[in-house]
């Protein structure tokens, strides 16, 4: 479930994932990890909604969104992979079965017990409850613990058809984490990120409705 594709000394443990790779063998490609809810029936979903920007999680109190050409190229990689798996992207999240959320971490953060997603709820304006609907956040039906540094992407595929309410949480059906060293070239960084996105889907053959 793991593959070497830009690496920032990452310690990442996913339940049901394979043994951590030998860091001596890592190159400048992204290190990609993926995980999913084994009970999810992805063939039951047809449409997905993905924002037109990448959430940047950093040191600022205000929400920051990455929307430039590089961000659009990375988001297009997600869209292409989702479309190739038989999912249809829609412009209105109210019409979507799934929500695809991409976040970028530009500062060093350490998280233990990722099973509690409250880690970003204190950031005003981030992908909070009003954005996805009237619900109390979301949850992971599997255990995850990891730390990561600058140059990391976290992607979550949410089940928007799950029961919503003040206490109910939307389940995360699939998540990918990729991290890598950043070069001084924007084009190189973007290229490596796109390769990482493609690898995340390549190692997630179950993520399809075909």
Predicted regions and their residues:
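Start-of-domain marker
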Residues: 18-47, 55-71
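N-terminal segment of the mature soluble domain
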Residues: 53-104
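C-terminal motif of bacterial Sec signal peptides marking the signal peptidase cleavage site
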Residues: 13-16
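Structural recognition of the beta-strand scaffold that forms the well-ordered cores
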Residues: 47-50, 99-102, 154-155, 172-175
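Positively charged n-region of N-terminal signal peptides that target proteins for export
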Residues: 1-4
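Low-complexity, compositionally biased segments in intrinsically disordered regions
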Residues: 98-153
């Amino acid at each position: 479930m793991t593959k070497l594709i830009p690496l920032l000394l990452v310690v990442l443990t996913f339940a049901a994932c394979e043994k951590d790779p030998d860091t001596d063998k890592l190159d400048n490609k992204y290190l990609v990890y993926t995980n999913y809810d084994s009970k999810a029936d992805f063939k039951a979903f047809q449409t997905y909604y993905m924002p037109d920007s990448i959430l940047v999680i950093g040191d600022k109190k205000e929400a920051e969104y990455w929307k430039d050409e590089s961000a659009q190229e990375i988001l297009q990689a997600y869209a292409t992979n989702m479309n190739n798996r038989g999912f249809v992207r829609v412009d209105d999240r109210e019409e979507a079965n799934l929500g695809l959320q991409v976040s970028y971490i530009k500062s060093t953060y350490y998280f233990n017990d990722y099973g509690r997603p409250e880690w970003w709820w204190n950031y005003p304006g981030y992908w909070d409850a009003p954005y996805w609907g009237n619900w109390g956040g979301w949850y992971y039906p599997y255990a995850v613990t990891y730390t990561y540094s600058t140059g990391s992407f976290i992607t979550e595929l949410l089940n928007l058809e799950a029961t919503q309410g003040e206490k109910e949480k939307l389940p995360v059906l699939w998540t990918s984490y990729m991290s890598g060293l950043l070069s001084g070239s924007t084009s190189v960084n973007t290229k490596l990120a796109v390769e990482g996105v493609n690898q995340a889907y390549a190692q997630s053959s179950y993520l399809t409705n075909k």
